[in-house]
């Protein structure tokens, strides 16, 4: 078995670490982790490496005064509508890009959204109604989700076409690419709709 197709050639230590992590998940979850179907390599060459002292001194996510998020850069910037957005913003702050093209694409996207107030408000309204899809998928994959959580996934998927529609006439490359990646998974949403009662019990 070779992982070279995933960009893991000459990365024996990383491959061993990934294997150990999968084994740990298998042992702790007491089942196959079938929802992990791909592997992506990560390199620090594309990002600024921030050590613990730098993170503390810049107060990116925690205040030096009491260690809480209050007063940190993250707390000031976080106007996200979803838990997924909050996690993404935190990751971007902790892993700043080094590539000029990537930085400029994000800036162009921010500029377009900032200049189009109606688009911004419509997107925020759709996202405000969305549940934490990443968390829901994880719970469903592990077999720990209840019926209401599966319905929450369906309700969130139903909002994606609206988001895609709002992004259709955007010109920023970052937003165009984002729109192309969004998949409403209509068949899955329909399947859930037909399989689960709209008002199931809690357990």
Functional labels for PLM-detected ranges:
Residues 1-112, 121, 125-141, 145-203:
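Charged catalytic and DNA/RNA-contacting regions of genome-maintenance
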